[in-house]
Amino acid sequence: MVTPSVGAIVLIPFPFSDLTNAKLRPAFVVAESGKDDWVCVQITSNPYADAEAIKIKESDFKTGSLQRVSYVRPGKLFTAGRIIFKRKIGMLADSKVDEIKESIINIIQSGK
């Protein structure tokens, strides 16, 4: 079990839509929500036509990295229990963390 922190990229199991299995995928840790639950955001390597997607590349990391250029999708928030966090991949630079948080706030305030 991993102890996450704000700004971390972690691997967690994302279930298939039919719930028969799950695949490990990266997620960005946004905030602690209490009782070992964390608010996270989806990360993908697919450049969706998502106007809010934020590109993350190797130079955006303080430590660690992803295998390829990826995209944080700030409109895809979810809560996950610490018990499902499998591995910490790295930490994003403070400036990138601030950019992602600002985007989440803008999405919430705009009502999108």
Question: Could you tell me what each predicted segment is?
Answer:
Residues 63-112:
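C-terminal terminal-subdomain/extension
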Residues 20-23, 29-62:
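Compact nucleic-acid interaction/catalytic patches
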Residues 18-20, 68:
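Coiled-coil-like amphipathic alpha-helices with heptad-repeat character
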